[in-house]
Curated annotation (Swiss-Prot):
Family annotation (InterPro entries): Snake_3FTx (IPR003571), Snake_toxin-like_sf (IPR045860), Snake_toxin_con_site (IPR018354), Toxin_cobra-type (IPR054131)
Cross-referenced Gene3D superfamilies: CD59 (2.10.60.10)
Pfam families assigned to the protein according to its UniProt record, in alphabetical order: Toxin_cobra-type
Name recorded for this polypeptide: Weak neurotoxin WNTX34
SUPFAM superfamilies referenced in this protein's UniProt entry, alphabetically: Snake toxin-like (SSF57302)
Organism: Ophiophagus hannah (King cobra)
Distribution of this protein across tissues and organs: Expressed by the venom gland.
Main location: secreted
Keyword Signal: yes
Length: 86
């Protein structure tokens, strides 16, 4: 009986994803390769871009607790899986 209980405890611990943290791309460039581990409570990756001067697109990527609101002339895309904000 003790063996069965111990086996169930081990299986439960292995199956639970304890301490999981989302990873998002985090950089201001269009072609981003920098991976960042999000803090506890940041469950969303975002990509924000807008047209700057001379029609140059400016990018920002990172982690957030909720999807940021788009400001004037901005597009914001959000997702919730690892490195999904490419």
């Amino acid at each position: 009986m003790k063996t069965l209980l111990l086996t169930l405890v081990v299986v439960t611990i292995v199956c639970l994803d304890l301490g999981y943290s989302l990873t998002c791309l985090n950089c201001p460039e269009q072609y981003c390769k920098r991976i960042h581990t999000c803090r506890n409570g940041e469950n969303v990756c975002f990509k924000r871009f807008y047209e700057g001067k001379l029609l140059c697109k400016q990018f920002r990527r990172g982690c957030a607790a909720t999807c940021p609101e788009a400001k004037s002339r901005e597009i914001v895309q959000c997702c919730s899986t690892d490195e999904c904000n490419h």
